[in-house]
C-alpha cells in the first residue's frame, strides 16, 4: 500500500520564523481523490499507484504562510473521470458540448469542495 509523502511542516514553520510574511507556494499538492481515480479506471482508464497529499495536511498548510496550493492534477482527474463516464454511458456522443458539460460540473464541484473545506479560502474574496 502506498503512503502519501508528508508535508514538511517543520520546514514550513522554520521559514515562517526566519522570513515572516514570506509567501510560500506548494507545488504538486493535489490530493488525488480516489473516487475520481476509481471512476477513471471503471470506465477504461488505467491509473496505477495514484497518490496525493491528504486533505488534512493541505488544510493545516493553508493556515500557515502558504498562500497558494497547486491542485492541477485534481482538476484533470475530475475532468477526465466525468468525460470517461459520459462517453461510456453515451457512446454515440461526439459533440464536445455534450461531454464537456458534465466535466465542467465535476470540476466545479471539486473546486467548491476544495475552497470551502480544504484550502481555507471560503469567504476571503470579500476581504480583498
Whereabouts are the PLM-identified features?
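Metal-centered catalytic cores of metalloenzymes
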Residues: 1-128
Amino acid at each position: 500500500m502506498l503512503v502519501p509523502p508528508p508535508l514538511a511542516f517543520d520546514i514550513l514553520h522554520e521559514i515562517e520564523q526566519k522570513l515572516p510574511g514570506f509567501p510560500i507556494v506548494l507545488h504538486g499538492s493535489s490530493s488525488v481523490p480516489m473516487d475520481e481515480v476509481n471512476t477513471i479506471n471503471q470506465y477504461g482508464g488505467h491509473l496505477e499507484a495514484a497518490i496525493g497529499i491528504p486533505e488534512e495536511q493541505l488544510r493545516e498548510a493553508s493556515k500557515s504562510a502558504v498562500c497558494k496550493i497547486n491542485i492541477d492534477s485534481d482538476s484533470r482527474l475530475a475532468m477526465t473521470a466525468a468525460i470517461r463516464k459520459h462517453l461510456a454511458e453515451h457512446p454515440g456522443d461526439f459533440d464536445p458540448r455534450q461531454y464537456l458539460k458534465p466535466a465542467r460540473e465535476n470540476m466545479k464541484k471539486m473546486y467548491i469542495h476544495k475552497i470551502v473545506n480544504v484550502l481555507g479560502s471560503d469567504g476571503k474574496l470579500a476581504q480583498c
